[in-house]
Amino acid sequence: AGDRTIFAFSEDYIADENRPTLGLSFKTALGELITEFRPYQKRLMPYFSNLLPEGHMRTYLAERAGVNPEREFFLLQALGADLPGAISIRQADGAGGTADLPDDSIDNESDRTSSGSQALRFSLAGVQLKFSAIQEARGGLTIPARGVGGSWIVKLQSQHFDHVPENEYSMMTLARMIGMDVPAIELVPVESIANLPTEMLTTKGPALAVERFDRLPNNGAVHIEDFAQVFGVYPADKYG
């Protein structure tokens, strides 16, 4: 009720000896499946909280969806069509979107009427402004409709620190030069990225395009789990 959430595995999942692993945090030290979890208030349990964006990106996507950014259950419901790794979130009855969000999860009347048409249905964890993008056969990158899909990540300039994309590009290039395995990267003009939301075109400087390691050429996805999820650490606590 309200902002109180409880996670539970389905009985079929629990009974399946060949079930896929959702995350190491759902197993005991001996590898047994944990099946009882405490309730959480407002925030989700750390595993799911770490699937959500942080900082300005979180605020931006929440505003587009008309959802209070602090109410994580409703935010995950709004963004859950395309999450990091191979996880997706949908309502138990198979319905999707924010049409069935309770009124008190939405900030105001204008957000309530616009949330369906304005929302972007994706999430990329972290604080940096970034979007998933499609590499077009003719060349160039396109932000897909609703933000869902794409095998590249486009990272925009930071609002707080100068030249973050250029710095990351330099570090990745140096890593490749010393023999480390790094993904394909490219610095691209922001204005060359098709379908990027117009409010992002004011960004000064190039964006960094990085090929996603959690996406496959056949539109498949690779299941991933970061250390914050493994150890049950909330995003705000992982930086220090």
Spans of features found by a protein language model:
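Phosphate/dinucleotide-binding and metal-coordinating scaffold of catalytic cores
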Residues: A1-G240
